[in-house]
Amino acid sequence: MVKNHDPKNEMQDMLTPLDAEEAAKTKLRLDMREIPKSSIKPEHFHLMYLLEQHSPYFIDAELTELRDSFQIHYDINDNHTPFDNIKSFTKNEKLRYLLNIKNLEEVNRTRYTFVLAPDELFFTRDGLPIAKTRGLQNVVDPLPVSEAEFLTRYKALVICAFNEKQSFDALVEGNLELHKGTPFETKVIEAATLDLLTAFLDEQYQKQEQDYSQNYAYVRKVGHTVFKWVAIGMTTLSVLLIAFLAFLYFSVMKHNERIEKGYQAFVKEDYTQVLNTYDDLDGKKLDKEALYIYAKSYIQTNKQGLEKDKKENLLNNVTPNSNKDYLLYWMELGQGHLDEAINIATYLDDNDITKLALINKLNEIKNNGDLSNDKRSEETKKYNDKLQDILDKEKQVKDEKAKSEEEKAKAKDEKLKQQEENEKKQKEQAQKDKEKRQEAERKK
């Protein structure tokens, strides 16, 4: 039996695999970024690993170095909600997610850069914003976002979340001020500062929350049997809930009691007792005051065997007004969470505390009997390279400074020598002039 030749079917068969291939390429582009090495200065190559460091403001990523480029693979998964998905949320939930975008403004205080746009923005299950693409200031794109540009893009995102007919790019490129929308959108556009915009969004969110709590209730008609089982279930749930709340209450009380005990030990300058009391507390859940108490106590006990001058310098840096991440670093270091300590130190771009964390990490690897020889060598090389990069950079800065000072001293010596020669010549000339005058006097 001979099959009839159908050009339409043949074309369809050809298009299907092509469409699937194109879809796979599109997903790859979403999950991956490639940066040519030609776009980066060679002396900055060692900084590229910062693009895979964990940060609360960015999607986790993995950096791979190829011959001519760096590839970044993003871990985009079901826990990440794309910006476009929140458009279908209820108004109060939508406002909550949008209000949290203000947190990304904190990135401008770090060395990282990012793109604030719909296709670059995701949210965690808790509604916290995370950006996909990140760069490094003066190293790799994207360029830093100014306060004015951040505010403009923030407004455009808010409007697009409520008005799907609007184009984000068109609003950002100049149509924002010309946009005529709802009273809500007008208020968003009129906000002159980030604080005013977030205050307005928070006000709207609170109104929506109040409206939902006062005007909405879910009622379901059920038969007697269903009602009975629901009642039994609710009773059981109530008992479990009371038990849980009791556990939570006593757990919180115990937690607060330990915090207070640590504070009392700190006042008595019993720094070792402070460390023992806070030993297994989660630093990320502590307030700034508790972190300060731990950080100062840890440095005072000098667990790292620091020299006196170095110790005093660190104590001067640890104050109640210090950066919370800086204080958290000392708790992570003291509790042996060295990877977290290294991440925080790198994020803060502080060479001194980064070196300290790396040295501790190398000692941990050295003393870890569970590691095979190959794994120990691999890990040692990894962290040794990071430490050496910092030392080389510091040595370069130190050498350049010494060279500059040497050149200044040399120039100063040459100038002084020239002045002495000039003074000597002036004295010799003055002596010659004097002798000529005396000779002239004798001949008269």
UniProtKB/Swiss-Prot annotation:
The keyword Coiled coil applies. It comes from the Bacteria. Residues 251-444 are extracellular. The keyword Ribosomal protein does not apply. It comes from Staphylococcus aureus (strain MRSA252). This strain lacks esxB and esxC. Pfam families: YukC. This is Type VII secretion system protein EssB. Residues 1-229 are cytoplasmic. GO terms for cellular component: plasma membrane.
